């Protein structure tokens, strides 16, 4: 492989919503950083049967519904 063409690949810690953590390799951040997930397999509707609502932390869903709410009606 060519030098300096690929991002640094290192170990990080991933923290799920329930507080559990695991280590994996990633290009995210730098060695030893922690990635805190907003939505993970324990809370995502695709894996939980769709009973839970997705948390709208950034207001994106609200803005979308406000702008395009008439589409699904």
From Swiss-Prot:
Disulfide bond residue pairs: none
Q: Which residues form the signal peptide?
A: none
Q: Which UniProt keywords apply?
A: Ribonucleoprotein, Ribosomal protein, RNA-binding, rRNA-binding
PROSITE patterns per the UniProt record, alphabetical: RIBOSOMAL_L31 (PS01143)
Q: Which Pfam families match?
A: Ribosomal_L31
Q: Which GO terms describe its biological process?
A: translation
> Could you tell me what this protein does?
Binds the 23S rRNA.
Under what name is this protein listed?
Large ribosomal subunit protein bL31
Source species taxonomy: Bacteria, Pseudomonadati, Pseudomonadota, Alphaproteobacteria, Hyphomicrobiales
Q: Which gene encodes it?
A: rpmE
């Amino acid at each position: 492989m060519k030098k300096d063409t690929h991002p640094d690949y290192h170990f990080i810690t991933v923290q799920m919503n329930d507080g559990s953590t695991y280590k994996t390799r990633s290009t995210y951040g730098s060695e030893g950083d922690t990635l805190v997930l907003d939505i993970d397999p324990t809370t995502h509707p695709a894996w939980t049967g769709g009973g839970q609502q997705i948390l709208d932390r950034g207001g994106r869903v609200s803005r979308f519904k406000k702008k395009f709410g008439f589409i699904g009606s």
